[in-house]
C-alpha cells in the first residue's frame, strides 16, 4: 500500500515506511518523496558560468587566475564519506572559511571538498569512485582547472569566471546535482561542505581523509594479481591525455596513482559503459 504522512505527533505509534509523522509542514513533501523513493533530477545547473565536458582540459595560466588551491603550498583533500540517512540533510551546502571574493587575488590557499552521502544501496567501495568524478565535474565548469586526487590536488579559478560571479557555493551545487544524477542508484541523500579555513582543512585531512585513504590502501594490499580473474582498463585521464589508457591490476595502480583495482571494479558496477572495462586474464 501507500505510506501515510500525518502532521500530528504519533510518537511510538509510528510505523516506519508506512505511517510517519512530520509536524514541520515545510518537510512534508521531502518526507513523502523519500518514503516513495521518488528522486527529482535537476536538468539545468544554476551557476553563472557554462558547464559542459567541452571545458575539460582547459588550462588556466597563473596570470589568468583569480585564486589557486594547491597541496604544494597548503593542505588539501577530497573525501566522500558514507553515513546513515538520519545523520545528514539532503542538499545542505556549507562553506567554511573565506569565499572566493574574500581571498586575495593571485594567492594559493587550502581547500577541502567533504561530501557525505547516504543510501540503502551505498557501499564504502563506491566512495572513491565518486571522489574520482570530482576531477571531471570541477573541470566541466568554464574557467576552472582541476588536477590531482585525494590530498594531492590543485584547483585554479580564472579571473573571468570570478567576474561572472562564480563562488564556492556553485562548486558545491555542481557536485550535488551531478552526484544525484550519475549515482542516483546508490545515493539517496547528499550533503556537501567546502572548506577554505586552513585549520579546519588540516583537521579534516588528519582525522577523516588520511585514515580513510589508509584503510582503502590496506584492503588493497591483501589482493594480488594472481588472486583475481580479471584486470580493468581506465580512461579517466583522457581529458588531459586523449590517447592514454591504463591497465589497472591489484598490484599496479593507474599512472595517476589514485585509481586502484577496487576503484575500477566499483566504477564498472556503477557505470557499466563507463571508463573502466574488464580485461580477461585468459
Name each model feature, range by range.
Residues 1-282:
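Cysteine-centered metal-binding/redox modules
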